[in-house]
Amino acid sequence: PPPPGPPGLPRIAGKGGISDYFFGASYGDSGTIPPPTPLHTKLSLQNDLRVLVHADPTFMAMNVLKRQFEGLFGTGISSRALSIDRLRQEILSNAARKSSRYDIIACDLPWFGELAQKGILRPIDDLLSEGNVDLGDFHRVALASARYRGEQCGLPVQTTPELLCVRRDLCDAAGIGVPFTISDTLETARALHSRSQGRSGIAWNAARGTPLGHTFMFVMGAMGRPFLNLAKIDDDYDAEWSTGENLRPVLQSEEAFATAEYLRELLDFSPVSILSMSWYERARAYADGEAAMAYCATLLAPLFELNKDSPAYGVTDFLPHPYGPGGKPIAPVGGYALAIPSNIEPNRVGAVWEALRSLTSPETIKLYIENGSLVTPRFSVSMDPDVRRISPVISIVDGMARSGVLQYWPRPPVPEITDLIEIIGTEIHDMLQGAKSVSAALADAQNRADALMRSRGHY
């Protein structure tokens, strides 16, 4: 018999193990999305379309397709790709210029609160009111992540949740099921951990600062509570409109302590380099067969989903974050949206909007996937038969978006999010190194985060 599924999620018949929980086959056949066609009139720009993006598979596909886009737009494209930290710095320094040196910028979803509050992004509601974008086709939480206090500031170009990737073949060989809960995950990691075979039980982000800060926030969300005291709405939390006391950190809560203890227990089944491991290293360890499981952003799934030499090729189950006693299955969303800088020359806005709309269209996002990306923020692209044949992960994420598993409240886009992540990731790293107790690390994180939010006048 099939293993039991996570609560509240239907099992859909099919092959391929647990991935079937989220497989998109039940949504009916969709038509095939055609390739992009040239714009009716070429973009009316005096010079090249200037784009600032992140160095990842989606934007690398955009770069590979540069000549094709130049043909579609009828103009040259000048593109610059930076690592995540350099990208944020460049966006901030560009905002200080009288006139933006970029027409379109790619923004990490949690940055939208900070960038919108500082007036760095041009709201696009007036452009959307023309009615030529089907907002209902986007994953709801990706669209909400690119909004700030009711104003839409960008359109998603990729949705890349962090999931638990599990080697189904190793679980089968060990006679165990794949994990759904936090306690399951510890047991599975223990069972599959084998130093003699050069394999760790699990790889995850435990590098100091930003990487570990993300892990803590996401796991605490799966324990059933965000790290800020966000207002509750039905079964979820308000990550858009919360103010005052609802922005107070809750790092002295039961869920925060449970998260810290869980991460400390994971150390025993983790790679020796775990305390310097971040996004790429953990995905690489999993892809190379050095870890039986990994918390992994789907953005990096091509390392094993499209690589036939990987031991994980074709034998990976993509699961939501394992949940704690008070939690439920969640997939914390990440990704990027394209936005227009507020200091762009006004006479460029019309043409740039045409380009941004085209670069986030179903036709173009399908093109990214055909050129090495495995992420889409659009339901229509996930349902395309050509796309579904490439990898099950695309349909799995689509199913999570439809069933409410995809969430952005574990890492809410508040203006201070970058600093808060850094604070938590620094204090918890001290704890994992043995320099502080769990209670001391959480007290220090609470005090520092609380001082930051007070200094910004939230309460």
Residue ranges of model-derived segments:
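Long, aromatic- and glycine/proline-rich binding clefts that accommodate carbohydrate-like moieties
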Residues: 35, 313-321, 370-426, 430, ...
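Glycine-centered hinge/linker elements that transmit conformational signals in sensory
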Residues: 189, 230-276
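Periplasmic solute-binding protein
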Residues: 109-120, 125, 141-178, 206-244, ...
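Hinge/lid segment of periplasmic solute-binding proteins
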Residues: 24-41, 109-162, 315-319, 388-390, ...
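Conserved N-terminal structural module of periplasmic/extracytoplasmic solute-binding proteins
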Residues: 1-114, 132-133, 178, 347, ...
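Extracytoplasmic/periplasmic substrate-recognition and gating elements
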Residues: 170-174, 243, 267-271, 296, ...
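A structural signal for short loop-to-beta-strand junctions that line the ligand-binding cleft
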Residues: 93, 100-103, 131-170, 200, ...
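Extracytoplasmic "Venus flytrap"/periplasmic binding protein-like
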Residues: 68-138, 147, 169-180, 285, ...
